Amino acid sequence: MKERIHEYCHRLHLPVMAERWSAMAEYASTHNISYSEFLFRLLEAEIVEKQARSIQTLIKLSKLPYRKTIDTFDFTAQPSVDERRIRELLTLSFIDRKENILFLGPPGIGKTHLAISIGMEAIARGYKTYFITAHDLVNQLRRADQEGKLEKKLRVFVKPTVLIIDEMGYLKLDPNSAHYLFQVIARRYEHAPIILTSNKSFGEWGEIVGDSVLATAMLDRLLHHSIIFNLKGESYRLREKRLQEEKQKDQ
């Protein structure tokens, strides 16, 4: 009987139940646990494990460069960031409203950290999330276009519930390359949100993409439904270096 139960659990793709049912049945017997409670605990263990595996899969597929949470963000070092507004984003209501989130500001002040934190929360809630830099995005689409696979590659960036585009503006894009980015923005417009980080102001986007008309078209779609954060302050890395140098002087 035990072998058959084990076999049936695997055939039904219930590996946790296959592994734990015998021990849990013995525990239920010795602790006077009802049949329904026993079954509930088995099913609960299976669901918890499935959810954990699902989240790990989503993290792997997201291409996030590292894991960050909002709890590790130093709001005291970045007073320009409204913690209340950031934590409101963690409710993920922006997903239902199809609102984009834009983090603007100089390098090293936590834009990517904040974007990844929101992405991690989306993954924890079961939403497909994808991370890529603006430069890598256009390069991948250009290569796919040359290989006759543009539509297939576009779906990689259009399909996820949340798309994080990092480092917009760190490297200039030629107009042809920028057009690929525009296609992604246009296809996600009013369908699914983009979280974007940039070290450039909106007024500089024409220079970034080499085409002011194209830049205006991008911004028109990004900003129509959006939440914007303008971060200011000293770079974390420069701040740590300065504090370290000051500490060494005091010694």
From Swiss-Prot:
Protein name stated in the entry: Insertion sequence IS5376 putative ATP-binding protein
Domain of life, per lineage: Bacteria
A GO molecular function held by the record: ATP binding
SUPFAM superfamilies: P-loop containing nucleoside triphosphate hydrolases
SMART domains from the UniProt entry: AAA
Signal peptide segment: none
InterPro entries: AAA+_ATPase, ClpA/B, DNAC/IstB-like, IstB, IstB_ATP-bd, P-loop_NTPase
Chain sites annotated for binding ATP: G105, P106, P107, G108, I109, G110, K111, T112
Keyword entries, A-Z: ATP-binding, Nucleotide-binding, Transposable element
Listed transmembrane segments: none
Annotated family: Belongs to the IS21/IS1162 putative ATP-binding protein family.
GO biological process entries: DNA replication
